[in-house]
Swiss-Prot record:
This is Probable cysteine desulfurase. Keywords: Pyridoxal phosphate, Transferase. It is an enzyme of class 2 (transferase). It holds the Pfam family Aminotran_5. Its cofactor is pyridoxal 5'-phosphate. One of its GO terms (molecular function) is pyridoxal phosphate binding. It catalyses: (sulfur carrier)-H + L-cysteine = (sulfur carrier)-SH + L-alanine. The keyword rRNA-binding does not apply.
Amino acid sequence: MRIPEDVRKDIPLTQEVIYFDNTATSLTPKPVIEAMDEYYLRYRANVHRGVHRLSQMATQKYEESRKVVADFINAEFDEIAFTKNTSESLNLVALGLEHLFKKGDKIVTTPYEHHSNLLPWQRLAKKKGLKLEFIEGDDEGNLDLADAEKKIKGAKLVAVQHVSNALGVIHEVEELGKMVKEEGAIFVVDAAQSVGHMEVDVKKLKADFLAFSGHKGPMGPTGIGVLYINKEFFDVFEPPLIGGGTIEDVELCCYKLTEPPERFEAGTPNIGGAIGLAAGIKYIEKIGIDKIEKQERKLVKRTTEGLDELEIPWYGPRNLDKHAGVVSFNVPPLHPHDVASVLDEHKIMVRSGHHCALPVMKRLKINGTVRASFHVYNSLEEVETFLGVLEELVKSLRSSQ
């Protein structure tokens, strides 16, 4: 498969716009849409406990999708629970482990987290009287691993992002995982910005819980997320949601939960979403995760070089080996929304604002950034067009000063 030409053929929108908003959501290739269409047109039915042929087919495809997801991140089949998105997955972890914490216990995270990997721990700390500590780092988002080792000592739980959605920094999650396991703490990984962009192996990361969304890196639909639950926690993690599908037996006085993964999926799941996610992962595997990572690195390199040439400030690690396909920048004195509007006039889609990472913006003393984020279907030609628009904008601003 030629990168990115053959991928672009499967995504008609790439012929109409320059789409640099992949951190928010990726575009959807035809095979994903076709897989979901097949479900809705040929075997639309609810899963589990149905004896008719449509339900049997839907159940088979749904569970096959779980296997595809599990294999992709090197997990076991029953360690995968489908959710709505990363945010829900992380909230479920905090709620399901709440009973393990007592007053004075320590949770450790970083100051660079997406709100979805910060607020659940803030709420839990407030509710249970816990200590919430943050691993120190610099303005590029690089963590101080010596400080991490100190902070992790005595921690009950450590929750970190794999890749920053605001700065693009790739954290040393594998190294952090070793520290956490040496301490005997629980390790939670927010992999929303890494799955589908780089290799993610739950065993290498030593993750106890790992969360991601289908609509980002994996190029699946919205409304489907994943929560990996290490089987060592099956009897410890209390499902926050129970009801239909989660039980083995019910009396008027009490109930008995069924085995995982069904016990973690209350009610009718997003069947079409799971099937679409699996199709997206198969598409990613067909391309090759190494080729995706290589293409994104090329795009980041040229983008940051171009911004430097234009003397436009950008944020994140200068060491591009630690920089994922996310480049945040500003064009002073313009507000990020104004820059994004100018780019939109040229059919270039970027994100602007605080990116659900207000502590990061406050640390940098800015009200937000413009964020260009890439996937395998983006091209160097698109980057040059993007830089050309910024060059004209900068010239206009500087000539009027």
